[in-house]
Design a protein with these regions (language model features):
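Gram-negative bacterial Sec-dependent N-terminal signal peptides
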Residues: 1-20
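N-terminal leader/targeting pre-sequences
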Residues: 16-171
Length: 171
């Protein structure tokens, strides 16, 4: 039986456009061996009043709410996890925190900019409900990765690593 960590990451390639209003990011499952099959895409769009809108079109995910973050590095390859063992997606690095706040205060707080609202996955494994991240733009996310974690998100300093191993990038 094949098991893979269900955390997803999308490495977002930089484009030549100086101020792109939208970007489509292909998402792939990842595991401790690297990048796996495509599971869908995210459409990222800047909005004038609200911030970054993220419209998912994803399939094959476990049902429930998932932690959803922008990570520093555009590489979603495997690396060493917090327990010292090989783990999926660790090359993505930590959450995007350009002001070096070191704080996990959620998508509407004054902490790091990597927190996004949770991604809701329906009973059939599809994620199609858009979220808006008020403090991000498409330009902020370019050259980084987006990770969908295996579990929910408590937006705290205490990470639930057992439920937050990473799993999927897109280039």
């Amino acid at each position: 039986m094949r098991t893979y960590v269900v955390t997803l990451a999308a490495a977002i390639a930089a484009t030549n456009a100086a101020h792109a209003a939208s970007e489509t990011v292909i998402m792939n499952a990842i595991d401790a061996n690297g990048v796996g099959e495509e599971i869908g895409a995210l459409l990222l769009s800047d909005t004038e009043a609200a911030g970054l809108q993220v419209q998912p079109a994803l399939v094959g995910l476990p049902p429930g709410d998932r932690g959803f973050h922008v990570h520093v590095n555009p590489d979603c390859g495997p690396g060493t996890g917090p327990n010292g063992q090989p783990a999926a997606g660790m090359a993505a690095g930590g959450h995007y925190d350009p002001a070096n706040t070191g704080k996990h205060l959620g998508p509407y707080g004054e902490g790091h900019k990597g927190d996004m609202p949770v991604l809701s996955v329906d009973a059939s494994g599809k994620a199609t409900k858009a979220v808006v991240v008020p403090h991000l733009t498409v330009a902020d996310v370019k050259g980084r990765s987006i990770v969908i974690h295996a579990g929910g998100d408590n937006y705290s300093e205490q990470h639930r690593w057992a439920a937050a191993a990473r799993a999927s990038p897109a280039a």
